[in-house]
Each structure stands twice: as structure tokens, then as C-alpha cells.
Amino acid sequence: MVRPPRSPFSTENPRSSFGGWSSRGVLRADLRIGTQLRLDRTAFGRVLVSFSRPEIVDRLRAQGVELPDDQIVAEVRRCGYAISEVEGPRTVSAVAAPIIDAQNECIGALALSGPFTGFDTDKCARIVVAAAAASAARLRGEQ
């Protein structure tokens, strides 16, 4: 598991997390180790598929795993991040970016999520891309 670089509120505790209140309803995004996410519909899944080696994607396809279509994969590669947005009263939007190691392999992804209403996709994309790049640099010993 890769942890993003610490922000000012987490410098004292490497296991800290951040939570907030939603003013108009309940929102819960609780992803624990072992949680399975769809590769075709989630920002995490789209990033992992888009930046994986072809043989990994081929193996998943052969196993019948639902994958994002070629148009989505091309867009994720072009942008350097993936989004998932679904409208509704209690839906969550997310932006994810790949963590690339020294061998130029995608070894994971970082994501930000929040309620669909008011979610600033562009701002969150900038934040998560920068955090993923910083995490990758740290893994390579550059920070």
C-alpha cells in the first residue's frame, strides 16, 4: 500500500485519515484493504487498466473481467488520470491517477472522492496527479 505524501494535518500521525461532514446528507466512502472495485466503472479501475501492461489486460479480458472500453482507456492515458461521476442524491465522484515506478510500471493508484454535488473534478485531478507523482518519486528515492 502506498500512502500519499503527508499533508499539514497528517504530519504528526502517519496513519491519519481525513473526514468531513456533508451538509445535505450522508456520504460514506469506506474502502478497506481487500475491497473489490469494478475496473470498468471506477476511477481506480480505469487507471489501473489504462496503465497496466498489455499482458495483464489480456489476462483479465480472458477471465471475463469487465474492462473500460478503448475510448475510455485512450482518454485516461491522454489525461493522465481517470474520473468516475454518477449523478444522484448520494453518489460519489472520484478522480484517480497512477503511481508509476522506476521501471515505468503502474504499481497502484491514488484517488480523491467526494459527493457529486460540488465536486471540482479539475481541481481534484490536479491534486491527485501531483500526489501520485510525489508518491512515485518517493518510491524511486527521489524525495
Stretches found by the model and what they are:
Residues 4-6, 36, 82-83, 94:
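Histidine-centered metal-chelating micro-motifs
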Residues 12-14, 22, 99, 114-117:
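Short, glycine/serine-rich, charged loops/turns that create anion-binding
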Residues 1-2, 90-92:
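Short solvent-exposed loop/turn micro-motifs enriched in small/polar/acidic residues
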Residues 95-102:
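A short, hydrophobic, proline-anchored segment that marks a local hinge/packing element in signaling
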Residues 11, 101, 108:
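A cytosolic small-molecule/anion-sensing beta-strand core signal
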Residues 1-21, 123-132, 139-143:
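Intrinsically disordered, low-complexity terminal regulatory regions
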Residues 21-89:
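Short, solvent-exposed recognition segments
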Residues 65-66, 72-74, 78-82, 90-91, ...:
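Juxtadomain coupling helices with adjacent low-complexity linkers
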